[in-house]
């Protein structure tokens, strides 16, 4: 598992604040960048990396809207199988957040144990249960902390308008997306 979070000055990212107005955004749209991490850097477990890692990327226009869960595509599995539940997203989501920010819950409310897989540039999330799927309704629970690459959450844009304490308290609730497991694999 490879994960590195690069934090850029929020003042350079948010529109209309001092650092952004004076210096502009830290990355330029259309430019290609290469992130390189050399051997010897300490990983999350306190061990030095053995080899160099690189990831190339091109900067696109910032997404300045909440994550639209209603635009996700849910492909439910077939009952009595261990086929994966598959979610596809219209844009990439935060890789680290996808591992912990989405769980699957049975119709009875218990978390279903299984393995998560993430691919297609963080635009597909797959969950393979440890035991066969039971027919019926289940739900996908989405953490309010899940972010896309621009820092947007299911509750709002990273640089959205000021929100009241009441609005912020609503943002701590977990969103749920129901899905049905039937006898034959189908789309919802």
How should each PLM-predicted stretch be described?
Residues 1-188:
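Acidic, low-complexity Ser/Thr/Gly/Pro-rich repeat segments typical of extracellular/periplasmic
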